């Protein structure tokens, strides 16, 4: 930890600056997308929002349970949050490549599901993967968030609010809650009139600079164990089961439960087979799962093993999801 004075504490390693600093910008963009969906997107109307909300909950709970079954009470139990995440950029990118084989209503469903999944991941990081809470710093963070929100309502310049956002990042970093939560908190203070322009400005640097840098910095792994030892490790079983099986199972099961209760219905022109295909694509954890790995485990060897498992599970989920969506249509049944 670099100490510039007796009271200013900041991360010092390049990897820390990527994971705590640059990724805060990614979470800022995620927060903007969540807020826009809540204000004017699919999540605005409660009846329409129920299906992706239930799907996201199922897609988080079932993978966590499956991981826990393989790592119950052991030294790797803290990794339960790893298979809960979905890489929104990858999953949406794949549906775009599939073109007309994925109906627009299904793409909208995936967007809403992935955004709720992002929100769930953010809450998990904030609550379960932070450090010891510094209540003074946390209180100062809340006060600064309120100040920024008031300034936004008064139409104070965005530049000044973003500068205050950097101060907010510092306070949250030292509060014991993960620093990236600052990005989401700041995003929720941005008024609707500024959301579209900010999202447009951030999409290219986030998707083509920040995420690739994060991926390159965090996917470099050293194989200190054999292939068979890696494949038969409880972490690999937990992550593979969670992402490849748990994601589609949880999403389909919770959607089915909702439709049986008559609380919602499938997106127009879609089938259960397509919903299962979307569930498989949601198993592409990649960047978000790797990010949670860096918080869940302190051992480099354990992190490397988990990263290999994430890459394998994400690749398998991609292949299964693409195949299912490519060879099916809305007339398909279970």
Where are these regions (language model features)?
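Transmembrane alpha-helix boundary signature
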Residues: 1-9, 13, 29-44, 61-81
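Structural signature of hydrophobic alpha-helical transmembrane segments
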Residues: 15-27, 75-89, 130-143, 177-184, ...
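Functional cores that coordinate and move charged inorganic groups
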Residues: 95, 99-191
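C-terminal ends of transmembrane helices
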Residues: 28-44, 92-103, 146-156, 190-197, ...
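Membrane-interface helix termini and inter-helical loops of multi-pass transporters
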Residues: 1-10, 72-76, 123, 222-233, ...
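Transmembrane alpha-helices that form the ion-translocation and gating core
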Residues: 54-92, 240-296, 315-327
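Predominantly late transmembrane helices and immediately cytosolic-facing juxtamembrane segments
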Residues: 124, 152, 157-167, 171-173, ...
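Entry/N-cap segments of selected transmembrane alpha helices
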Residues: 37-65, 134-143, 147, 223-249, ...
């Amino acid at each position: 930890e670099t100490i510039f004075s007796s009271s200013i504490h900041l991360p010092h390693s390049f990897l820390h600056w990527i994971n705590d600093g640059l990724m805060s910008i990614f979470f800022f963009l995620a927060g903007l997308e969540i807020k826009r969906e809540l204000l004017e997107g699919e999540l605005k109307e409660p009846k329409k929002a129920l299906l992706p909300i239930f799907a996201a909950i199922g897609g988080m709970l079932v993978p966590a349970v499956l991981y826990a079954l393989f790592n119950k009470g052991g030294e790797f139990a803290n990794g339960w949050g790893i298979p809960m995440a979905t890489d929104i950029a990858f999953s949406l990118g794949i549906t775009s490549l599939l073109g007309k084989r994925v109906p627009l209503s299904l793409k909208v469903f995936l967007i809403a599901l992935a955004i709720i999944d992002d929100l769930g991941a953010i809450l998990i990081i904030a609550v379960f993967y932070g450090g010891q809470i510094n209540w003074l710093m946390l209180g100062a963070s809340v006060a600064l968030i309120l100040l920024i929100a008031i300034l936004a309502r008064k139409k104070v310049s965005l530049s000044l609010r973003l500068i205050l956002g950097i101060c907010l990042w510092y306070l949250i970093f030292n509060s014991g809650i993960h620093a990236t939560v600052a990005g989401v908190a700041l995003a929720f203070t941005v008024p609707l009139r500024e959301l579209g322009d900010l999202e447009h400005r951030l999409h290219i640097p986030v998707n083509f600079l920040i995420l690739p840098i994060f991926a390159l910095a965090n996917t470099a792994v050293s194989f200190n164990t054999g292939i068979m030892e890696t494949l038969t490790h409880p972490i690999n079983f937990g992550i593979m089961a969670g992402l490849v099986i748990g994601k589609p199972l949880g999403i389909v099961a919770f959607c089915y439960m909702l439709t049986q209760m008559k609380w919602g219905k499938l997106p127009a022109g879609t089938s259960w087979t397509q919903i299962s295909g979307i569930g498989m694509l949601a198993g592409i954890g990649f960047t978000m799962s790797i990010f949670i790995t860096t918080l869940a485990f302190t051992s480099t060897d354990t992190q490397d093993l988990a990263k290999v498992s994430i890459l394998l599970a994400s690749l398998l989920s991609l292949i299964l999801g693409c195949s299912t969506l490519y060879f099916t249509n809305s007339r398909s049944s279970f």
